[in-house]
Amino acid sequence: FSLSSWYLQKQVATGETVEIRFYLDREGDYEKAEYEIGYIQIEGKGEVSDSEGMKLVNREVRPLAEMPGLDTENPVKQVFTLFYRSTSAKRSELKFFVRDNFGREREMTVTFDTENSAVKE
C-alpha cells in the first residue's frame, strides 16, 4: 500500500486550520488488511483532528476504520481527511504514518511554513 495526499497549502497562520486529505492506495492481497494511523509533531505546535473534531493524540495510533468520513467506496483507494490547527508562530512539521496488521508501515511528512500577517517596520 502507499500513502499520499491531495494538494497541501504551504503556509499556515497561528490559529488557522488546514485540511489534509489522504489517499491510501492498496494493491495485492489486502482483503484482510486492517490499518491504523498516527502522527508525530516534529516541529512547531498544533492539533490534529478528524472531520468530527475528535483530536488525535501525538505519538498514539488510532484504527483507520474508525475514522469519520473514511471513503471506502473504492476498495483500492481509500480517502480520509484530517485537519491541522497551528498553535504556534513557528514552522510546523508533522510525520503521519499508517501501518497495517502485516507489519508494513508508510510515512508521509507534512510541512507548513508560518504565515506572517503583519509586517513589522
Language-model-detected regions and their locations in the chain:
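First exposed extracellular module after export/assembly in secreted or surface-exposed proteins
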Residues: 1-121
